[in-house]
């Protein structure tokens, strides 16, 4: 009886593990598809004449709140002034 319970538990655990792994694999494939789509959009932007490095910077900055951006800018200005770059 105890062996049946242990075997059932192992079967359930194996099934859960398999399901989790398959979900991760599907998500990884979706992530790859999305990354390819993003790459295509950047290629389109470059083909239109936009600077993709600037676009990437803008996207990175838009993810931050205003206070965080201002703090980052202040530190950058301070460092540039210390190096005589401004």
From Swiss-Prot:
Organism domain of life: Bacteria
One MF annotation (Gene Ontology) recorded for this entry: DNA binding
Pfam family, one: GapR_DNA-bd
NCBIfam families according to UniProt: PRK13694.1
Protein family per UniProt: Belongs to the UPF0335 family.
HAMAP family: UPF0335
Name recorded for this polypeptide: UPF0335 protein mll3968
Organism whose genome encodes this protein: Mesorhizobium japonicum (strain LMG 29417 / CECT 9101 / MAFF 303099)
């Amino acid at each position: 009886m105890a062996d049946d319970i242990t075997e059932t538990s192992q079967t359930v655990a194996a099934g859960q593990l398999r399901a989790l792994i398959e979900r991760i694999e599907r998500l990884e494939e979706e992530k790859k598809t999305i990354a390819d789509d993003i790459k295509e959009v950047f290629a389109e932007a470059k083909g239109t004449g936009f600077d993709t490095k600037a676009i990437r910077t803008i996207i990175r900055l838009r993810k931050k709140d205003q206070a965080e951006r201002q703090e980052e800018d202040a530190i950058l200005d301070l460092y540039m002034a210390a190096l005589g770059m401004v």
